[in-house]
Amino acid sequence: MRIFIACLLIASFGLPAGQTSQTLRDRYGEPDIERFTAPRDIGLTVEYGSDGQACQIVIERKQPLLHSEKVSNYMSPEAVSEIIDELVPPATRGHSINSMIESMGCAEGRTVEYENVWIARHSDMCVPLKRERESTATVVFKRQLCPVSPYAQMHK
């Protein structure tokens, strides 16, 4: 019995330690991208600037990082609006500067440019409209320490 316990202890020391969030932070520093889970199984992927403030946020149905099966990827417009309003309250966006709608078949993309942020939403607009029809939404902050946004490049 003593030999068995000794072997078990020796074997357990040889196993690699789990990679926790804190272990990875200690080894590599603060992440520049993180993912959070909002209500209704919606994922928020956030890219940070060098100052640690959010620069870009992608809102989409949460999926495993490595996935072989397509998960239902649509969200209700109400849920997406609620999350966007939490992340960027209307009073902080600044005045609306420009808006654009792209439509191809059933796919529709709407981008609104404000003084401080761009907000883009992509939906399946096939009739009859489904309750869950938004595939992604993107919030891009216009800050000096953020990478140049693809939206900024489109509006030069």
Each model region followed by its residue ranges:
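N-terminal targeting/docking segments
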Residues: 1-2, 11, 99, 138
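Short helix/turn-capping signatures at newly exposed starts of structured segments
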Residues: 2, 9-90, 150, 154-156
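Non-cytosolic coordination micro-motifs
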Residues: 66-156
